[in-house]
Structure formats: C-alpha cells, structure tokens
Regions:
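Hydrophobic, Leu/Ile/Phe/Ala-enriched alpha-helical segments that form helix-helix packing faces
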Residues: 16-24, 64-69, 73
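A short amphipathic beta-strand at an alpha->beta junction
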Residues: 66-94
C-alpha cells in the first residue's frame, strides 16, 4: 500500500517551486520555473519561452524574486531564458 504522503526529494522540490510561484505572482503563468545545477551551485531558471513578449522584470520585481528565493533557499543565482538562450543572470543577494 502506498503512503498518501510521498516524501521524495522530487516532491519537495516541486512543492518548493509551487510555493515560489505563489510568492511571485507577477510572473506569467506560462513561464517555466526550474532549478538547475551550475558548477557547484544551483540556479533558478525562469524560462519565458512560451511568453517572450512578457519578458520584463523591473527592480522591485527583482527584489521580490530575491526575497522569495532566499526564504525558500532555492538557489544562488537566477537565470532568465527565452528557450535555450540566456537573456539575463542575477546573483541572489543575501
């Protein structure tokens, strides 16, 4: 019998990304959010492939992204992509 609670790292990761999305409601729902290993660090990737016309993050939104990432300990940096092309990179400030 399978437990109703599935405590796998993939499930925790998905729960953290779902919580992150709930904290940064200004991001388009069609944007993709994932974490990627980058050398010895982990980066949060926000991909605007499905909505390139909506790629715009202002200074206040960047601050909110940093707060949400730090509160959930998700990553050291943010990568903004449109498809496979990196269009921005920000180091998360403590």
């Amino acid at each position: 019998m399978e437990s109703p609670l599935n405590y796998t790292s993939a499930n925790f990761e998905q729960a953290a990304l779902t919580k992150f999305r709930s904290l940064v409601t200004f991001l388009p729902q069609s944007s993709k959010i994932c974490r990627e290993p980058w050398g010895r660090s982990t980066v949060l990737c926000i991909n605007f492939e499905n909505c390139p016309h909506l790629f715009s993050v202002n200074q206040e939104q960047t601050r909110l992204l940093f707060q949400a990432i730090a509160s959930l300990s998700l990553a050291d940096s943010i990568i903004f992509r449109i498809g496979s092309k990196i269009v921005g990179w920000k180091k998360v400030k403590p």
